[in-house]
């Protein structure tokens, strides 16, 4: 079986250029749009597998990608075990990192540029999603996320994130 990914790679710069052009031509985000993103992020934290929320998730992801007002900087080093594509809920977790980070920045505009705070906000959303997923799918456990839950319960999540994001380039 062949993969289509190598053929798609040359088109990625064009896609990013088009997204950047669309973002620049857009005006500032409305307060209603911002609040909608926050509401969607929090709904998904509680019910990440609710299929009725999937269109909302897609809208919010697109909004975050195209909106120049809320610029997120995710450190994927915080989610190491999710790089393997076999993890069934990988997309839900990664999408939530993006949406929870955006929601954090919308709720805390004074933290724009604070990569640590932004990523901790994203990870806290991820841990809520992961907890909800594991509750209905006990076999969905991932060691790295279990360890982060344990760090969060001991008040060590910020310290862990601070050390981990040193390896990320923002």
Where are the model-predicted features located?
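Immediate post-signal-peptide N-terminus of mature secreted/exported proteins
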Residues: 24-62
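A generic alpha-helix preference that emphasizes hydrophobic side chains
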Residues: 20-21, 95
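Domain-length accessory/inserted modules outside core catalytic folds
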Residues: 165-170
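Bacterial N-terminal signal peptides
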Residues: 10-20
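Basic/polar N-terminal segments that are highly enriched at the extreme N-terminus
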Residues: 1-2, 22-25
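Mature extracellular/secreted ectodomains of secretory-pathway proteins
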Residues: 52-164
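Bacterial N-terminal signal peptides that target proteins for export
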Residues: 2-12
């Amino acid at each position: 079986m062949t993969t289509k990914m190598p053929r798609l790679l040359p088109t990625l710069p064009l896609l990013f250029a088009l997204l950047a052009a669309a973002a620049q031509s857009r005006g500032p985000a409305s307060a209603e749009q911002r609040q909608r993103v926050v509401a969607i992020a929090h709904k998904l934290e509680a019910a990440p597998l609710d299929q009725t929320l999937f269109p909302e998730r897609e809208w919010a992801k697109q909004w975050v990608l195209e909106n120049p007002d809320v610029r997120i900087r995710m450190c994927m080093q915080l989610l190491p075990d999710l790089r393997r594509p076999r993890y069934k809920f990988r997309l839900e977790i990664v999408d939530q990192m993006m949406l929870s980070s955006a929601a954090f920045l919308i709720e805390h505009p004074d933290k724009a540029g604070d990569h640590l705070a932004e990523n901790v906000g994203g990870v806290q959303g991820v841990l809520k999603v992961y907890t909800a997923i594991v509750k209905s799918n006990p076999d969905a456990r991932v060691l790295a996320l279990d360890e982060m839950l344990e760090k969060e319960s001991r008040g060590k999540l910020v310290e862990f994130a601070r050390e981990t994001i040193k390896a990320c380039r923002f």
